[in-house]
A protein has these predicted regions:
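Primarily extracytoplasmic/secreted proteins
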Residues: 1-220
């Protein structure tokens, strides 16, 4: 069954007022950004950190996730965050989706690069795989486009300092290669490419499957 995004929301705040539609078992993925400071964004209780890194000395991004226990989960407060993307992601029966590998890049240019992922990170035994890209450009006049193969899911801007976008591709069957997009004005950016993997829950389909969260075969670039 294909990994799919059930819903997404964006808010210029440290918490989400209206969560995207979700149900028990869905992966809730939060992409949090602190603009104007390299102070780390702090995760709320119950969320697991997947990645965190400064954007030069003028920003900080944090990726966190949890699995919904009901259809009425809340975001909690992501301390120091100025902007949040929240995604609800589903998979097939008796499976879970987990965030596997992140490649990341940064620079100051009109060319924004989404760094390649490596052969060792591609889970050939997975039921399904998908990709999520996220980029922050510190010039609010720039127009962001989706990297090749992905579709824009949600965008945000504070209309003064930055613009941000998250994109998605379902049913990914090949390793992500280094890919560029261009913007009109040279600006500091931070880009991420996150692979999502679907795997059977142990014991749900006769055993097998990949290692589930807490011991997954993932990593960073």
């Amino acid at each position: 069954v294909t990994i799919s995004i059930v819903g997404s929301t964006s808010q210029l705040a440290s918490s989400i007022t209206t969560m995207p539609t979700h149900a028990a078992g869905h992966l809730l993925l939060c992409l949090a950004y602190n603009d104007g400071s390299s102070t780390a964004v702090t995760l709320p209780s119950g969320w697991v950190e997947r990645y965190g890194i400064a954007v030069g000395g003028v920003g900080y991004i944090r990726v966190g996730y949890r699995y919904a226990q009901s259809s009425s989960e809340t975001s909690g407060t992501w301390t120091n965050a100025d902007q949040l993307f929240m995604l609800s992601i589903s998979s097939g029966a008796n499976t879970l989706v987990f965030p596997n590998f992140i490649s990341s890049n940064t620079g100051t240019a009109t060319t924004i690069n989404f760094a390649a992922q490596t052969a060792a990170t591609f889970q050939t035994g997975a039921d399904d795989q998908a990709l999520i890209s996220w980029v922050v450009s510190r010039n609010s006049t720039n127009t962001l486009t989706a990297p090749s193969g992905l579709t824009a899911q949600q965008s945000a801007t504070d209309s003064a300092n930055y613009v941000s976008q998250v994109c998605f591709q379902a049913s990914r069957t090949t390793i992500w290669a280094s890919t560029n997009i261009t913007v009109a004005t040279s600006a500091l950016y931070r880009s991420l490419m996150l692979s999502l993997v679907e795997s059977p829950v142990y014991g749900a389909s006769g055993g097998g499957g990949l290692i589930l969260p807490g011991g997954f075969n993932g990593g960073f670039n």
